[in-house]
Amino acid sequence: ALCRRGLKLSDLPIDRGVAYLLQTQEADGSWYGRWGVNYLYGSFLALRGLRASHDRTASRAIWKAGRWIVSVQNADGGWGESCASYGEGAFVAAPSTPSQTACGLLGLLATGQVESENLIRGARYLLDTQRADGTWETTARIPEAGSYRLFASPRRAGTTDLPASA
């Protein structure tokens, strides 16, 4: 987005953004999310930013994040994460959803894993769960009580936009 506003990849705001992402990566390779649930969402967005930066110092972080995304893929090929991950401060697995599967797929694509078996399994999950009208089932997840995350309660997790972008 900054590049579309006229900044060059070598400009200070880009360098600072890359440095921030590299400093805030979790030990397991993921990133904490702020607006979506949670580590899958944060990781896919961080990876997109790092990939767009073309910063060579980010290659290890990108690789590590790709390994993490693969490690949390569900047996059905999709991805899912519980809202409890906010309270736990770590990824909490949940049944696969289309929106979180999209985050997993988009994250893997950002790592450069464009022909991996994990990517194929995730895409198959989305195809298998897509309705005849092209949409996916929408589920509601309610974040833990007392959390500022109640801004969108119940939170819609499974809208058509994110899965369709994957």
Each language-model region and where it sits:
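An alpha-helical repeat/solenoid feature that recognizes helix-turn-helix modules
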Residues: 1-19, 23-166
